[in-house]
Amino acid sequence: EFSNFIEDPYITADIDREPFTDEVEVAIIGGGFGGLIAGARLSELGFEDIRIIEKGGDFGGTWYWNRYPGAACDTEAYIYLPLLEELDYVPSQKYAHAPEILSHSKNIAEKYGLYENACLQTEVTGMRWDALASRWVIQTNRQDRFKAKFVIMSNGPLHRPKLPGIEGINSFNGHTFHTSRWDYEYTDGDSNGALEGLRDKRVAIIGTGATAVQC
């Protein structure tokens, strides 16, 4: 009954492709900074057959999902953003905002050719070791069943919204959404604000952490 809280509101078009049944040298599960750095460094070492499997519609990890108004990183950009020298990039602010971080993620993937063999909008549903073939067999929700010589687990915990255990949450009739799935169709505006859709609304924010303060 809470499936709407985990749907991806940022996908503009569903990916239509045939299931993969091939073999790759390296499979990386997760397209956030961990997966991107792994893919980049492997590429620098000469690995060419790299496939990143990412549930979201693009690279970025937590910065793909968290696009709420005011979202920013509380660590200095020169420390937080990876591969700055490799991309010859200078952050625009001391504390980068979410759109810039997401853009940097995509630029990393572009530079290292990680889009070419990626499985976006794809979730791993199973993985087992084939001892006879000495390969991992990976299955996904898109009916993929391919093999990999090496697997790097780079999936984080922040892609799934944490709902509060409040009595009556499942029967509330007002409009609700999680900050990691911000509903701009309802609020209008963008990450900079201008939420005209909320002008005449009474809004309750559940939580008092950094996300609540920023948005």
Regions found by a protein language model. Name each.
Residues E1-E25, L45-D49:
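Rossmann-like nucleotide/phosphate-binding core characteristic of flavoprotein oxidoreductases
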Residues F2-I15, L83-P91, H97-I101, N155-C215:
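Glycine-rich dinucleotide-binding loop and its adjacent helix/turn
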Residues E18-T21, R145, G197:
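Short, flexible hinge/linker loops that cap or flank conserved catalytic cores
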Residues T21-I52, A212-C215:
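N-terminal Rossmann-like FAD-binding beta1-loop-alpha1 element of flavoenzymes
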Residues E23-E25, Q121, D200:
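Phosphate-coordination loops involved in phosphoryl transfer and adenosine-cofactor binding
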Residues S43-Y68:
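Glycine-rich FAD pyrophosphate-binding loop
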Residues Y64-N107:
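Glycine-rich active-site loop/strand segments that organize a redox cofactor
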Residues P91-H159:
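Feature captures the FAD/FMN-dependent oxidoreductase FAD-binding
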